[in-house]
Amino acid sequence: AKITFTNNHPRTIWP
């Protein structure tokens, strides 16, 4: 899993 921040909003991306 990878956590990225978009507009200061944490989002978890599952490949």
Swiss-Prot record:
Keywords: Antimicrobial, Fungicide, Secreted. It is found in: Secreted. Disulfide bonds: none annotated. One of its GO terms (cellular component) is extracellular region. One of its GO terms (biological process) is killing of cells of another organism. Has antifungal activity against B.cinerea, F.oxysporum, M.arachidicola and P.piricola. Inhibits HIV-1 reverse transcriptase. Belongs to the thaumatin family. This is Thaumatin-like protein. It comes from Castanopsis chinensis. The lineage of its organism: Eukaryota, Viridiplantae, Streptophyta, Embryophyta, Tracheophyta.
